[in-house]
Amino acid sequence: MKPFKLLLVLLISFVLFTSFSTEFTVKDKIVILAHAGYVSHYSTGLKYPVEVEWWDTKARLGCTTKFPRKDQFAPDPLLPAETSLADDYSGSGFDRGHMCPAADNQCDSEFLTECFYFSNMAPQYHSLNAGVWKTLETRTREFAEQLDSVKVWCGNIGSVSKIGEVSVPAKCWKVIYIKKTKVWEAYVFENTKEQSKKLDQLKVKVSDVEKLTGFKFKP
């Protein structure tokens, strides 16, 4: 039995979303969904996760045989009515952008299935999803493979438009903490079609992300 799985069935708590960035114009309900491979703070109003967190480790990433990615996107069984979003994304022109990426989960079939829940997705322009966002995902895995344990937090903020009932976030962000070296890195990405900046140009202070989101990051 995996650690988070012990809490899986009904570890759902509701928080009135009043302390987060003023970019949110309405009070919003956030549902905490604890899965075996990640925890999602999912907005029922925006229909995307405002924060997702997990640990990348050598053990998590280091298998010799990986499960194949099948792209079976699905509602989250902990919150199916709020995460049945396949039709909203279909034909929208936006990628179903993973927060906890598939490549972090291919050593465990349960992890891989869970990471395709819509509670782990946000609409991203392909240029972001396949560009600097993917570059940072790879960088994070390399840190974990070399230095053993990396805590990852990432999420989305704001709403510039909608695809069906799903808000398109204005920004995406990620914070990582490397346990062995006690090094932190933080990034904020504009969710726009044109992506001209390199990853290093998007680096910010952790305190900047805390101010933007209202989250306090502690490993």
Please identify what each model-predicted range represents.
Residues M1-E23:
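Bacterial Sec-dependent N-terminal signal peptides
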Residues L7-S13, V31, H35, K66, ...:
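Short linear sequence motifs
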Residues L33-D95:
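Short, His- and charge-rich active-site/binding loops that engage polyanionic ligands
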Residues P77-P219:
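Domain-level detector of nuclease and nuclease-like folds
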